[in-house]
Amino acid sequence: MKTAKRILALVLMATMLVSFAACSEQPAADDGKYTIGICQLVTHEALDAATKGFKDAVVEGLGEENVTFDEQNASNDTTMCKTITDNFATKKVDLIMANATPALTAAVTSTKDIPILGTSVTEYGVGLGIEDFNGTVGGNVSGTSDLAPLDQQAQMILDILPEAKKVGLLYCSAEPNSVYQVNKVKEFLDGKGITTAVYTFSDSSDVAIVAQKAADENDALYVPTDNTAAECSTAIYNAMTTKKPIIAGEQGICKGCGIATLSIDYYDLGVKTGEMAVEILKNGGDISTMAIEYTPQEKLTKMYNESICKELNIDVEALKNAGYVAIEQ
């Protein structure tokens, strides 16, 4: 009898331990506490601003005491992105914020259950390989796009640099969203009778030599929204022994090597992404029906780099009169 009682006690104890373990595996959101994993591809001004905006909006919506951020940086290593997002999935965080396309594609392969919000992703259809993309990813994925109107950026080349007849299109070949942007800008410029040439670098190791070649062979350059270019923007400018004007895809790149851009505000982009996170976590929003959010036209800003414009004898007063504002250095 004592043996039977001892066995029963052990069974009950084991059952209790399993129950406690099961309880500990429940998401922290059950008591209003949330853990959010942030995977940022690389450190540069635009992505940093998006992450800050995201965190500020989440804290505003959930309360600082109710959210813990597990913030990781992949140092521009796509393999590290996958390691980070796999770890988030193992930890069963309540939501993943993926900052930049490689972070998003990694997160999508790590989990089909945890909500994933992308930000600083230019074109979700291209990044995720979705044919006939209709604006909603579905499943456990949504987010915000940093795509600015490419035809308007291309038109800036014609407006600011009317004497430019040859334009080099410079970007990182490892970034599919850069290919998408360059193809659109090339199509626009070709239609206007401008001669275009494409120049690609594979990573930061060859960006300088490719940038110099592009500058030597063209009257002006276009650099799209591109994470490697953003990380190396100053190196791009310094590599040009003969300085040529660059129209940039966003203000961070323009700050390092460009004369002008039509840019979104990455902090505001992050804020919008954070508001989406609050809607999902606090209000029970259905991420599968959430369309990708884009910056409206009225929030885009025409910007110029005063120091580079002056160095290249670009008429700053004309830019001001056309509604351009100076980038803060």
List the predicted regions and their residue ranges.
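Hydrophobic alpha-helical segments within soluble ligand-binding/sensing domains
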Residues: D30, Y124-K166, I264-G285
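Pocket-lining segment of extracytoplasmic ligand-binding domains
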Residues: P176-K244, E250
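Beta-alpha junction/loop-to-helix N-cap segments that form part of ligand/metal-binding clefts
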Residues: D70-D132, D226-G249
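An alpha-beta-alpha
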Residues: I36-I38, F54, S142-L189, D286, ...
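Short, low-complexity disordered leader/linker segments with a strong preference
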Residues: M1-T35, E60, E64
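Short beta-strand elements in bilobed, periplasmic/extracellular small-molecule ligand-binding domains
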Residues: K55, E60-C81, N140, K186-S204
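Extracytoplasmic "Venus flytrap"
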Residues: T35-K55, G61, D70-T79, A174, ...
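Hinge/cleft segment of the Venus flytrap/periplasmic-binding protein
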Residues: E279-Q329
